[in-house]
Amino acid sequence: MRKIVLYVSVVTLLVGAVYFLSYGQEKENAMPVLPKENAQPGPLQGYTILVDAGHGGYDGGARAGVSKVWEKEINLQMAGQFRQALEKAGARVIMTREEDKAFADKKRPDLDARLQMARDGQADMLLSVHMNQYHSAMESGPQVFYRKDQENSRLLSGCIQAAMISRLQPRKERKAMAGDYYMLSLDIPSVLVECGFLSNPEEEKMLLDDAYQKQLAEAVCEGVCEYFALKSTEKME
């Protein structure tokens, strides 16, 4: 009996020694994972973009007709999707808010605070995220707005509008529209993206869907990339 126990103990020690030596050899031969030297930077590398989730706090914005969700909540979700898409493309993203809050008790000071964030962060672009609403439930489709006196913003709005139509294929293909928007009063290209109509039950359902939000954000990012590509081409000419 003692011989059997001794034999089993010796075998166990031998097996353990072989495993230890082979494991040590594997670790010694393992190559560290290094970043690829030829990895290309994203198309938005070097750009800083401010993403503004419209409304917040006491200002709920529009309200969805079916779910009764406030616009401020969906804006925040969508702004997060914008951030992910833009950062994936290499941009540095500044968020005006990442929670339900306002920056002042009145509308104009609240907007001023958001604009100041863009100045302080030396943003190259401003994207303000909103949801639309109309008295008719038939209206649908995303739409981009810009200030009529800003040529770069007009170009940016056209790039984003075209990308959203191409990717999302909405029933109603809207055109980018000019207006007098205080939130877009910076010297940098600035647009207001109305992602869709909360007054349209079908579109409301889409706007609350995570997959659709991601798809829309990727379309916006594509438009932003196209804008900077066009501006780079202008500089080279």
Could you say what each language-model-derived stretch is?
Residues 63, 121, 128, 135, ...:
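Active-site-adjacent mobile loop/cap segments within catalytic or ligand-binding domains
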Residues 20-35:
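Sec-dependent signal peptide cleavage junction
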Residues 92, 172-175, 189:
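Conserved beta-strand segments of alpha/beta enzyme cores
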Residues 152-177:
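Active-site-adjacent substrate-binding region
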